[in-house]
Amino acid sequence: MLADGEVGTAKKDDDAGGFFFTADDHEALIHRPKPLADEAVPSGNGIAAFALQRLGFLLCETRYLDAAERTLRACWRALDEYPHGHVSLLTALEEYLEHPEVIIIRGDKDELARWQSAADKLYAPRRLVFGISRTEQGLPGALADRKPASA
């Protein structure tokens, strides 16, 4: 979905925001559904908005944050009318309104384990901690710019 650098182009609704259930190259349908409500599984749009936000925060990529915001805006009426049926969208909205704290740790394997353990000890539900090896190559986005300190 993101390999070409685009945000879900085959399922994205460029006009209204959000994502359709089927790709644009799918057989012709009378109605192209865009699921918003959670059922036995969470809504694809709720999960997409949540994942795009997390990816945007991690990589410092506004295109992912913008796509998440457009999805939330497209779903606003459904959220307003029946919030209990849209928990995955509410979760994404909550994180949109109160951004997470992102901690990226680069270092050797032993250092990573120690720092991650220390960061995880404090209860912080809005904290995302990522440990990336000092030797990791080919990182995307802003992660490539964050070089580990010299040993």
What are these regions (language model features)?
Residues 1-151:
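Glycan-recognition and catalytic cores of secretory/periplasmic carbohydrate-active enzymes
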